[in-house]
């Protein structure tokens, strides 16, 4: 099974830059709960669980960290799909996730306008299921990725909106 992520950056969610901060806990628990369901299905079907992240700050990194935290399950494979070389390379967890990744794909040598959209389409094309950490606003990259997944007939699982309210 192949699971992708689309979700907002920490600023839009009103959350700290560090995705391991306790304020991220409700979202991290939701991700882990969803991944646990997929692990069961994959185990029953004797297949790997492939996780696809775009490596943007916020939801993408939180998803990758959750996947890596389940390292005791050998069948989990982390695929980091970057729109361009060195994308988000100053992020606190960049080097750690690069070391843990099964696959590290840089879709372009340089950043260009629209390269994020190419990365998002790559993830939609690869995944069977898309987890969406979305605030409900029909604008921006997360919304466009959801629309791409809908048009492609992908299963989409939405993070409950009550978890997105920064308390």
Summary of predicted features, one role per range:
Residues 1-166:
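Acidic/glycine-enriched connector segments
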């Amino acid at each position: 099974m192949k699971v992708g992520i689309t979700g907002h950056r920490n600023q839009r969610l009103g959350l700290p830059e560090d995705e391991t901060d306790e304020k991220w806990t409700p979202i991290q628990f939701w991700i882990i709960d969803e991944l646990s369901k997929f692990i069961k299905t994959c185990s029953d079907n004797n297949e790997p669980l492939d996780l696809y992240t775009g490596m943007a700050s916020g939801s993408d990194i939180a998803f990758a960290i959750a996947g890596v935290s389940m390292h005791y399950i050998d069948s989990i494979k982390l695929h980091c799909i970057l729109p361009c070389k060195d994308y988000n390379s100053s992020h606190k967890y960049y080097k750690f996730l690069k070391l843990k990744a099964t696959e590290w794909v840089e879709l372009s040598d340089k950043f260009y306008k629209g390269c994020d959209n190419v990365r998002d389409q790559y993830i939609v094309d690869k995944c069977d299921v898309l987890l969406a950490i979305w605030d409900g606003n029909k604008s921006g990259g997360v919304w466009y990725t959801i629309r791409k997944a809908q048009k492609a007939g992908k299963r989409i699982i939405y993070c409950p909106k009550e978890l997105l309210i920064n308390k």
